[in-house]
């Protein structure tokens, strides 16, 4: 097993090399490192001081938009957001001793994929391949594990909670019930962690009032939002995210060869339809 004394080598450059990160992924990791190295990363702090620091570094970010420091990385579809999640986790674990991550998926398909990509070394797309810091596979907590298992988070090197936002919203009241194994509710257990990082895949799905409130109540140390569409619709109006720190649009992804140019297929002879 790798000694934690060896974690010093897990710089952003080292992680980017081992994980073969693409340019926008590597840049996102560097930005996270710069921000974390500049702010006071702690729970229950004055968000305005951290916002001032982040805004000075990345003026596009004008508001964290949540009750905790939350940063959006707006990357075009096809660039590889799941691998970037893995890079974020590896960096925060090795460089800042963060051991608890709560990953939110926008639907069942992505949720099932994330469980495999983050927790199954036999999966061809397992994101932590080659990283010695994860010689022991991260402990995945998903589905109804919070009810059925005697969860002792302190026993694991790293815990990754994976939840589908729909199930999370539906199960929220049950998660707030007292858990006989924990001695408190699962929600209280999570909220009490001083190192919980919330990672939101396709985060534009989590800005509805219900999901917004439920995630705020987890009181995470940090939020990391990944989306290709950093805005929400309010009627006919488009409301852009205010907490974006990095944008890599579709035009850049096409120019760099990471995704194909979208094409609309048409048909000339359609009289018989």
Question: How would you label these PLM feature ranges?
Answer:
Residues 2-74:
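Conserved pre-motif I regulatory segment
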Residues 73-79, 202-206, 217-237:
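Conserved helicase ATPase motor motifs in RecA-like P-loop NTPase domains
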Residues 81-91:
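Motif I (Walker A/P-loop) of helicase-class P-loop NTPases
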Residues 97-132:
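Conserved Walker A/P-loop ATP-binding site and its immediately adjacent core
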Residues 97-99, 158, 194-195, 219-222, ...:
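Short glycine-/polar-rich loops that comprise or flank the Walker A/P-loop
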Residues 108-111, 166-170, 204-205, 229-233, ...:
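Conserved nucleotide-binding/hydrolysis micro-motifs of P-loop NTPases
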Residues 142-153, 158-214:
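Conserved RecA-like ASCE ATPase "motif II neighborhood" in helicase/translocase motors
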Residues 238, 242-273:
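Conserved interdomain linker/interface between the two RecA-like ATPase lobes of SF2 helicase motors
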